[in-house]
Amino acid sequence: MTTVAGGVRASARVLARGDGRGGTVLPVLEGEGPLAVRRTRGSGAEARVMLVGAMSGPLGGDHFEVGAHAANGARLRVGSAAATLALPGQDKAGARYDVRLTVDDDAELYWLPEQLISAGGSDLTVTTSVDLAAGARLLLREEQVLGRAGEEPGRLTSRLTLRIDGRGVLDQELLCGPGAPGGWDGPAGLAGHRAVGQLVVVRPGFATEPPAARVFEEGAAVMPLAGPAALVTAVAPDALRLRRLLDGALASLD
């Protein structure tokens, strides 16, 4: 961890590999400062890792980076111990949170952090970059809550890119809060909802049997992507309803 003018810079890194006996080992498990990583009890061939926030933030001016790589034969599940709370800092600059995920052939990554809460007065840019081999499997969940109870949201910019076998499959950006383009909270945007989320599901079997595009209950939709992948998007009045929508849509894909 380093402290620079205006904020903290910290990173965490996880590398998982198949052990050749049907299990998964973690040769790299590194974190610093506000980004602590802990191995927890896994199940079967799966290794589980928890991101633990050792400090509050990100605050204005902070820059956090997290990387996870599921190498050949690995089964890796990554979660977080609590929600991430973006807060304003003494520095008026925005904060950054960059996530880079890589999954090799015959490997699987479940990326399931808790919600990101954009507190009033905060300014956070989140980028998630995912690179998958042709035979990789992925479940990625993103959930954003705009403001705490009774509070207007901060400014939140979130971009997600997905590449499979070197080919771009998804590149989308969400901008909410002060300074966002007009209409972000209108009928064509979030329509007054304060929780928004998505799932990206990549399974080789989707190449021959892609899921059908459909509405899943009120506020959620399932869409096939141009690859062995599906995207679930949802909006809801609160984090609890959002999670229920995403979980239900995921179950419908099985």
Swiss-Prot record:
Entry keyword annotation includes Cytoplasm: yes
GO molecular function, one term: nickel cation binding
Keywords of this entry: Chaperone, Cytoplasm, Nickel insertion
Keyword Manganese on entry: no
Gene Ontology CC annotations of this record: cytoplasm
Primary location group: cytoplasm
Compartmental location: Cytoplasm
Function: Required for maturation of urease via the functional incorporation of the urease nickel metallocenter.
Family: Belongs to the UreD family.
Subunit structure: UreD, UreF and UreG form a complex that acts as a GTP-hydrolysis-dependent molecular chaperone, activating the urease apoprotein by helping to assemble the nickel containing metallocenter of UreC. The UreE protein probably delivers the nickel.
HAMAP family on file: UreD
Name of this protein: Urease accessory protein UreD
Organism for this UniProt entry: Streptomyces coelicolor (strain ATCC BAA-471 / A3(2) / M145)
Name of the coding gene: ureD
